[in-house]
Amino acid sequence: MKQLFLYLWFICMSTLTYAQQVTLSGKVEDAYTGNGLQGVMVTIRPAAGNRILKFTKTQADGSFLLSLNAIPDGRNVLHFSMMGYAVKTIPLSKDTTVYHVLLAEQATKLKDVVVKAPSIRQRGDTISYNVASFADANDKSLADVLKKMPGMEVSDKGEIKYNGKAINKFYIEGHDMLGGRYSIATNNIHQKDVGSVEVMTNHQPIKALEDMSFSQDPAINIKLKESAKSRLVGTLKAGGGMEQKKGEKFGKLNVWEGEMSLMRFAKKAQSLNTFKSNNIGTDVTGEGNLLFSDDGTGVMGNSYTLKDYVNVSPDQLTDISDSRVRKNQTHVFTINNLWVLGKNTDLSSQIVYTHDRLLSSSFSNTQYFLNDSTIYDVEDEQAKQKQNRLVADFTLTSNGEKAYVANQLSADLAWNDVMMDIAGSYPNHQQVNMPKYKVSDKLELLHRSSKRTYTFNTYNAYMVNPHSLSVDNSQQTAYQSVRSAAFFSHTNTSLGFFLKPFTVMMKVGLQVLSRTMKSHLEGVPDSLGNMRNQIGMTFFRAYASPEAEYNQGGWHIRFQMPITFTPYYYNDKLMGAKENASKTLVAPQLSVSYFLTARLQATLSGGIAQREVDEQNFYQGLLMRDYRNLYTGFVDYTADKSKHISFNISYKRPLATVFANAYIRKSWSDSHLTVARNFVGDYIINSYFSNSSSSENLMAGGKVSKGLGFMHGLVSVGFDYLRFDGFLRQNDSPSAYSSDNYMLSAKWSGRPVDWFNFTYELNWDKDKMVLKNLGFDSSSTNLAQNLTFNFQPLKSWFIKLHGEHYRNQIADHQHKNLTLADASTSYGFKNGMELSLTALNLFNQRTYGYTIYSGLTRTGKEYQLRGRTILMSIFFHF
């Protein structure tokens, strides 16, 4: 009886206790971005005291749970605190168990205590770099500091990679104002206005897919300082000086530069406007270029563009900076705005205008290696190029947890005029007009219902390229006109299911193309071929792509197998010939990733494909690309085959500032056609020969970087290797060849003492070409080194010394050394103003040369450098 009584008493007490059990839950978000905050301390404490009664921390998505026997009375509060955010307290109520809390950022101030933030912090998949830890007084833009951060790579074009992977989004305070044109921000936002740079290592930009579709791509979010928010900030720069031009006296004011950036980043709106103008060689035209795009590639992408049948442009440099050679007048302005229409809805606009006038002078000596001889061409080129470009994008985006809507209206209008005088083997004067016009609209819809997603996407674009080329020589005048135009439409829909850990999806779509091309060539011998083209091409490409993903236990596996059916309708209006065909192609792909540890990830991927027909090569008449090269197409619907396999491995220890990645990729291609070129008189006839050929590519490389905390520096080493085995038919004789390219890079930077920092960079490459038929090989090596010293003798006085050394092979067993030196000094004032004096090319070096290989061709190039320049400028940051 006693045992029965105790048992009943225990049951009653347990039931009573369970009945009183209460769970408080909720979510804590950033008041500005709306993103969930991880690691917020949530406590229950008396309203008038600090004694903690119960506590927990928020999860990765900002959610929290607190289990209580009963809700305390109204004299207790929920207390939310996190470093960098204002504390928030909410009185407890017996009627409320779910709380939605917004925390506002706030600088943490400690009386009489100096707190030094860690240079790198990690929170889940997000790595935060403290900008102040990597910046010094000589750094102006955010890009200057990004280059010093371990794991970061910033190319000369402004593209950002994190541990070897290109970023897929760039945010400013959680908003995507610039799309893929993020170098506008990195080159114009002053580093002193940025508090931190956040890297989201596995970023899924569509919130509704965050737990359904895994992404391995990183993204960057710029966190501004509180002092740079909700007010106008920016920079001003103006300067002028003298360049010692050939044949002119030194002392004439003939160079200038001006820059202005004005921006405001508030909670509900963002604005970033820039203007840059100079004739000192600095290339700012690339700031408005897309550095990434979500248009995709291949059969399921929107990347269709018209081919440039005419293409004449000044020679492009490698290794050395463009600013050493560019003789320019450049003006660029950008207007970028974003308006926050709702919690997840943004409207953004971008307008970019570029005007660039460029003079160039170069010399080249080209060798064409044939089986029975070598052909030599010499060119002395003097070119004048004028480019104008206007780009406008208007984008509406709603990115919620249940639905995603985005619509982008774009226009890209470009004008490109070139006049070029050629002396040497084939003296001539070329004049070319190459405008390009494109307008497009892209709509993306996604709806998520529990474990299911539905998408609908449509993209429509119209593009036209009316090009013309005239070539005058001592014997005749040749004229080529080409007008190509296309309407491209792509619509697809998909249905996906999330059956954890699997995601399966079926996507079906239709691409429609209607393209015309009309050309007329005169002034070349009729014996070379037909001089006119007037063709039309239409296709309707239907496809279905089953896709499946597995994501669990460190494994991420993705498989897709697009199947396409394409009827083609080709009409040669001049020949009165119609050639129609239908093709069914399959291209399965598999990718397997495994996180061996939280720091080490490996990915193996591969695929087999039948490549889509290159219908823009469907033409019969000749087209003159430049004064020397004529092209003719080939109408053939046979599909080429390809396969590839790749392996990537990456390792990171952010808090120890160690990053490493390596890759290897092998690809094979089988074609039913062989690329052919024949040397006929003054011309090279480029065409296709109906004979099967194959090629192979091998790429391998890696990079290791390590932060040097003891000297506030960085050391990195990288290596890349590229091998190509191919086949080319020259003068009706087959030539098998291979090329090898080796590239080594290294960087060492540091700030061992407060008043001195340095940066050293090394780049070495070797090109080798082998003609297998003859057993002949040729190679060249190039070495480039850069060394920069920055001194700070006084708090506001700075001195910069910069040197460059190049050792390039210009002929067999013959190298040329070139040393360039610059120096500058500046003085800063408390109001943000800075005066500087800069001397460029102190030794007044005049030429730069190197050798390159490409497709059984070896070319030695030499360029005219800008002369010694003295520039005085004033800079102001406000």
Outline where the language-model segments fall:
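Outer-membrane beta-barrel translocator domains and adjoining extracellular loop/strand segments
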Residues: 210-212, 247-249, 284-290, 359-376, ...
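Conserved C-terminal beta-signal and adjacent last beta-strands/turns
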Residues: 743-766, 774-878
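Short Pro-Gly-centered beta-turn/loop motif in secreted/extracellular proteins
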Residues: 38, 65-74
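Short, acidic Ser/Thr/Gly-rich low-complexity loop/linker segments typical of extracellular
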Residues: 48-65
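Face-selective signature of the C-terminal outer-membrane beta-barrel domain
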Residues: 338-356, 384-423, 427-571, 595, ...
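N-terminal secretion/transport leader regions
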Residues: 24-29, 37-46, 77-83, 101, ...
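Membrane-proximal, glycine/serine-rich, low-complexity loop/turn segments characteristic
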Residues: 20, 61, 71, 83-93, ...
